[in-house]
């Protein structure tokens, strides 16, 4: 019995305090080329050790970034989720993974004396991504209206919801993911819905409030490189060491931004 006790004691005394951060590396996170600001931030990962490879620990990480940080503008109530799909050198290349409205924006729109209309739809893009889009809109007073409330009849609500679903389906079905994200950035879909429903009942605050990624096609590096504005170099890069190629393309960031 005593033997075991002393053995345990010895083990406790020997333990050295190792700073866990000494085993970790910082990686840069890069957003796709559709956004103005490509450098989102940094992320930590434990260095490659034995069978545990660092890049595997990074793949699948989701970063939630405000649109204001991606586009350098003031409107900050849209949040985009970006997922790491590939690691090249010290860069994590991300792809669109979803969109959301901030809680405070959502709560500020919901008020009394108006009807809230919500719709959702599952659509597949032309390049095989299955998205679920949620839309929200609110009725508003007509210009000459005196009555305090502006409630839509159930029939009108159903018509508006049908229109919402039609427009969302149409806008996504005919485009690939890149185009869809380009539409989500200024939320042109919401504006289209607002215009289309004007004849049924005047709406305001119409937004695609959320986009979920349900299914993705098989991962292709070439497609991801195209998203990151390096489509031309990706063909050549496959033969040589990819790390150096990407580093170079990365050094040329300002001109890339101007073209966007």
UniProtKB/Swiss-Prot annotation:
Tree of life domain: Eukaryota
Cross-link (Glycyl lysine isopeptide (Lys-Gly) (interchain with G-Cter in SUMO2)): 30, 245
PROSITE patterns tied to this protein: RIBOSOMAL_S3AE
Modified residue annotations for ADP-ribosyltyrosine: 151
Residue numbers bearing the Phosphoserine modification: 232-233, 259
Biological process terms in GO annotation: cell differentiation; ribosomal small subunit biogenesis; translation
Task of the protein: Component of the small ribosomal subunit. The ribosome is a large ribonucleoprotein complex responsible for the synthesis of proteins in the cell. Part of the small subunit (SSU) processome, first precursor of the small eukaryotic ribosomal subunit. During the assembly of the SSU processome in the nucleolus, many ribosome biogenesis factors, an RNA chaperone and ribosomal proteins associate with the nascent pre-rRNA and work in concert to generate RNA folding, modifications, rearrangements and cleavage as well as targeted degradation of pre-ribosomal RNA by the RNA exosome.
Protein name: Small ribosomal subunit protein eS1
Gene for this chain: RPS3A
């Amino acid at each position: 019995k005593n033997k075991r006790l002393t053995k345990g004691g010895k083990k406790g005394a020997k333990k050295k305090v190792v700073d866990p951060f000494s085993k970790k590396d910082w990686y840069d996170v890069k957003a796709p080329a559709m956004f103005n600001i490509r450098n989102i931030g940094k992320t930590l990962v434990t260095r490659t050790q034995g069978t545990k490879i660092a890049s595997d620990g990074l793949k699948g990480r989701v970063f939630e970034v405000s649109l204001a940080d991606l586009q350098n503008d003031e409107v900050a109530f849209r949040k985009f989720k970006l997922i790491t799909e590939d690691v090249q050198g010290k860069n994590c290349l991300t792809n669109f993974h979803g969109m959301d409205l901030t809680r405070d924006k959502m709560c500020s729109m919901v008020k009394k004396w108006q009807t809230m209309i919500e719709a959702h739809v599952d659509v597949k893009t032309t390049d095989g991504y299955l998205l679920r889009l949620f839309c929200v809109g609110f009725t508003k007073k007509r210009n000459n209206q005196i009555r305090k409330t502006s409630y839509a009849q159930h029939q009108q609500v159903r018509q508006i919801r049908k229109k919402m679903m039609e427009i969302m389906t149409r806008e996504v079905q005919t485009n690939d993911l890149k185009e869809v994200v380009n539409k989500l950035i200024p939320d042109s879909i919401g504006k289209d819905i607002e215009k289309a429903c004007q004849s049924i009942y005047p709406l305001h605050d119409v937004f695609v409030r959320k986009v979920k990624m349900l299914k993705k096609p098989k991962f292709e590096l070439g497609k991801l490189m195209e998203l990151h504005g390096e489509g031309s170099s990706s063909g050549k890069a496959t033969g040589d060491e990819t790390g150096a190629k990407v580093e170079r393309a990365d050094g040329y960031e300002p001109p890339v931004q101007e073209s966007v």
